[in-house]
């Protein structure tokens, strides 16, 4: 939270305690991003996740073409990858829980740019 406040970001805290923000992106579009408040542990690593949604499937399963496109994009992404969260395609960047404000800002930027580009490609809309 300190890094988020230090940057002067406008945010809401959702029911899970996560930080929800909306940023302006190119082409008069906006993109939603969540900085998870919970920290995941793996061995000596403490990991914070940044999530940004791009697509909602009409059924529980993603269409094959969409799933394959998300996998291809995950390979190209410098930071993060696509995950399926229920019916939502979510771009997730994982960073050190003690990342600096600059590192957090870069991770947020990677998430919103990647998710917004995919949302535009798959849906031609700006719902997130």
Which stretches of residues belong to each language-model region?
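Ser/Thr-rich, low-complexity intrinsically disordered terminal regions
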Residues: 7-57
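Poly-acidic low-complexity segments
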Residues: 30-32, 62, 96, 100
């Amino acid at each position: 939270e300190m890094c988020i406040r230090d940057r002067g970001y406008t945010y809401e805290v959702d029911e899970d305690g996560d930080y929800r923000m909306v940023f302006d992106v190119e082409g008069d579009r906006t993109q939603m991003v969540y900085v998870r408040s919970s920290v995941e542990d793996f061995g000596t690593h403490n990991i914070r996740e940044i999530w940004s949604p791009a697509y909602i499937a009409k059924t529980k399963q993603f269409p094959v073409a969409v799933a394959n496109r998300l996998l291809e994009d995950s390979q190209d992404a410098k930071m993060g990858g696509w995950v399926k969260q229920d019916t939502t395609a979510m771009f997730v960047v994982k960073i050190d829980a003690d990342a600096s404000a600059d590192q957090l800002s870069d991770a947020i930027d990677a998430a919103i740019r990647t998710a917004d580009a995919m949302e535009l490609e798959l849906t031609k809309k700006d719902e997130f």
